[in-house]
A protein has these predicted regions:
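Hydrophobic h-region of N-terminal signal peptides that target proteins for export
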Residues: 10-18
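Cysteine endopeptidase catalytic domains of the caspase/legumain-like
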Residues: 2-6, 18-238
Length: 238
């Protein structure tokens, strides 16, 4: 019995060591026309992509501006996430404009229902969506009366409540990212790894980013984490 228990423990530890993170990043600063442009969203996506590109346990792809179309993002998720095993992490990061129930790509809307349909195809335990957009909290709602999203095994980490703006950092600060992504990037680089075990969990990331954004914004922006997931879910490891 003792030997059997050791075998199980070893198998679990091996799976954690081998677990990988597969990421699709998208950010749009320059929308079609000029009235809807943002300053830093493309930089946001590139900053998060860079973290995972440099991480030996991760793979990432990034689309910005005119390349961040609805179909390109869907195709990228299909191509990237099919590589994931059951104990890996699949992740979508988006920075740009949002709408209730979805996000605004370069050429149209990408709804959460579509993202969930894509993620549902893959037998992966750990699924993550990061969204940096004004009124991001509204993005988990739609006009559909039969909303099954709360039953999905997906972690949503949104940059602000449904009534709040998601702030861009002032030009004079030297940062080229939004406030949420500044702290998300720092957290993913290791700042949020509170127990220093080189594995960052959902709870650790939420605590770090939420406290940082709330303090830096003067209590005007409050990131929210929502969904059906384990707080000990790994997000990235080093």
């Amino acid at each position: 019995m003792q030997r059997f228990g050791l075998v199980i423990l070893f198998s679990v530890l091996v799976s954690l060591v081998q677990a990988r993170t597969y990421v699709v990043c998208a950010g749009i600063s320059n929308y079609s026309g000029t009235g809807n442009d943002l300053r830093v969203s493309a930089y946001d996506a590139q900053a998060i992509d860079k973290i995972f590109q440099k991480n030996k346990y991760s793979e990432s792809v990034c689309y910005t501006n005119a390349n961040a179309t609805t179909q390109n993002i869907i195709d990228a998720m299909d191509t990237m996430f099919v590589k994931a095993d059951k104990d890996d992490v699949i992740m979508l990061y988006f920075s740009g404009h949002g709408i209730p129930g979805g996000m605004v790509c370069y050429d149209g809307f990408l709804y959460y229902s579509t993202i969930y349909q894509v993620m549902r195809k893959f037998n992966v335990r750990n699924k993550v969506i990061f969204v940096d957009a004004c009124f991001a909290g509204k993005m988990r709602y739609s006009n559909q009366r039969d909303d099954r999203r709360s039953k999905e095994n997906v972690m949503l980490f949104l940059s602000s409540r449904s009534t709040e703006l998601s702030m861009e950092t002032p030009r004079m600060t030297g940062f080229h990212n939004s406030l949420f992504t500044v702290f998300l990037e720092r957290g993913l680089r290791g700042g949020a790894d509170s127990d220093r075990n080189r594995t960052l969990t959902a709870d650790e990331l939420y605590t770090y980013v939420h406290v940082g954004v709330v303090n830096a914004s003067g209590n005007r922006q409050h990131p929210v984490m929502w969904g059906k997931f384990n707080g000990n879910m790994p997000v990235i490891k080093w």
